[in-house]
A protein has these predicted regions:
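Oxidoreductase and adenylate-handling cofactor-binding alpha/beta cores
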Residues: 168-170
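Short strand-turn motif at the edge of the Rossmann-like AdoMet-binding core
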Residues: 136-138, 162-166
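N-terminal glycine-/serine-/threonine-rich beta1-alpha1-beta2 phosphate-ribose binding loop
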Residues: 1-131, 143-159
Length: 170
């Protein structure tokens, strides 16, 4: 039987998913406490090529509810295929707009875009309290990595994971 906890474990081990951490039981966070068997509301940023593989792998777990899709090239055949498959998800071409307009519905994001975009997307998502799975490399410079590590400490309830396609089941 699939559960939210199994999804988290699988995602962490396979580095192809979103790891969603525990939430504290403080009064401020009661609205974020959810059941163990509830699906993770996921937004996928980058849904073609590698991003599409991540999207489908996460969907195949049965533990992710795909609520939003974002890709700059909505006209590409592989992107069109994924948009048709997840026709109920909101569609965006700009990740900032997606996080602004659909952010209240999103618990986690996957980042499967070209390398130069990993850092700004991950930082914005973390800053908004979203759990993040990002493909390698996390960022382009050591300074960007240091900023990400500082953000991970600052947003300690947000789980951030970097995956490596060569060591992933996706």
């Amino acid at each position: 039987m699939s559960s939210r906890r199994k999804f988290i474990k699988s995602a962490s081990l396979a580095t192809a998913g979103i790891a969603v951490g525990n939430w504290s039981a403080s009064a401020k966070s009661y609205s974020r406490i959810i059941g163990a068997n509830k699906k993770v509301n996921l937004a996928c940023i980058g849904i073609g090529n590698r991003g599409g593989e991540i999207l489908n792998t996460l969907n195949d777990t049965g533990l992710a509810n795909i609520v939003a899709l974002c890709d700059i090239d909505m006209g590409a055949p592989h992107t069109q295929k994924n948009m048709e498959q997840f026709s109920g998800a909101k569609k965006f071409q700009n990740f900032r707009e997606m996080l602004d307009k659909a952010g209240n519905e999103i618990e986690a994001v996957s980042v499967g875009v070209p390398d130069f975009s990993h850092f700004p997307i991950t930082m914005m998502a973390m800053g908004l309290g979203k759990h993040v799975y990002v493909e390698k490399p996390m960022a382009r410079t050591f300074y960007e990595i240091e900023l990400m590590m500082a953000a991970a400490k600052k947003y300690s309830k947000v789980v951030t994971q970097m995956g490596n396609q060569g060591h992933s089941e996706a």
